[in-house]
Structures are given as C-alpha cells and as structure tokens.
Amino acid sequence: MKEIVIASNNQGKINDFKVIFPDYHVIGISELIPDFDVEETGSTFEENAILKSEAAAKALNKTVIADDSGLEVFALNGEPGIYSARYAGENKSDEANIEKLLNKLGNTTDRRAQFVCVISMSGPDMETKVFKGTVSGEIADGKYGENGFGYDPIFYVPKLDKTMAQLSKEQKGQISHRRNAINLLQAFLEGDKNV
C-alpha cells in the first residue's frame, strides 16, 4: 500500500485525507516526528502550507503533503481566514471559535462564506507544488449536525440544504474544499502538468 505523509497534527484533517485516499496508508506526521511543529508565520493559506510541507520534507527526507485551510466570511472581510483554528484565541475550542464568529456576524444578512484549502507537496528532489480548492456556502444562524469538526456545524451548503456537519464523511469527502484541492493534486500526480 502506498503511503502519504500529512504534515499535520490535526486529526480532523488527517481523517479527511483517509476518507479521500482509501487506497493509501495515510500517516500524520506525529507518528513519525512526535513533536513536529512549524510556526505558521505566513500571511496566506499558501504561505503556511508551504512552510509546513517544506519543513516536514526536509526533516523526513521524503515527499510530504501539507495543507492550510480555513473559513473566509465575506461580510467580515475574509475573517477568520488564516486564523480560523485560533479565532477565539490560542488553544480555544471549536465551540469558542464558532461562538465568536456567530457573535461577530450578528444579524448580518450577507452570510456568504467559503472554506479554502491550499495543499502543498514538497520533497527532497522536487519543486514545491501548490493546489487550491474552495467550497462556497453560507453561515447558518446556529449549529446543525454532529459530524465533522471546526466550523462544519455552521457552514451551510445551499445546494445540499445541509451544513457540513449534517453530511456523512463520504458526502463531505466528495464536495469539500480539501477534496477540490486534492482533485488538482491527483490530476498532477497522474501526469496533467497543466494543473
């Protein structure tokens, strides 16, 4: 079985990759380097993904995939953006992040939002490649559903009439921002150099 190393300690992200790559042995970097951590000093999802994949590839001397992803709310000028995981502060829960976002959005009628995922792939003998995927939706007025993680309970997908947290893992795996970025990665790996 082929192996994919993900430069992330976020179990939710690793589980997403496992669903999307069922024919691969997906390994989170903490299984190989328990204390691996890269300070995300970039100002964009792309910069942070590259920081992680290049640091992990150098440390392991093998090809590694990293992603940086988050939620952008149009009425909040793209917040929480690259701060999605720590929107309510360092080491705060998903619940705290959701509460802050809903409070900040208030009764705003423009609730358009998008999840963004930038995947970078780095290795010892290759130039880093970057792939970006998005999924559009709206911020719900409250939390709905029990599945997923992060902002999934408040991210409403109009064409499905459900939040991401109301979707099965398989359904989410087919439409997610991560899936869209991975589609580009897969096309590249299969030889489409126009990606």
From Swiss-Prot:
Gene3D superfamilies, per database record = 3.90.950.10
Positions of Mg(2+) binding: E39, D68
Question: What biological process terms from GO does the record include?
Answer: nucleotide metabolic process; purine nucleoside triphosphate catabolic process
Question: What's the catalysed reaction?
Answer: XTP + H2O = XMP + diphosphate + H(+); dITP + H2O = dIMP + diphosphate + H(+); ITP + H2O = IMP + diphosphate + H(+)
Enzyme class name: hydrolase
The protein's assembly and partners: Homodimer.
| Record protein name field | dITP/XTP pyrophosphatase
Q: What species is this protein from?
A: Staphylococcus aureus (strain MW2)
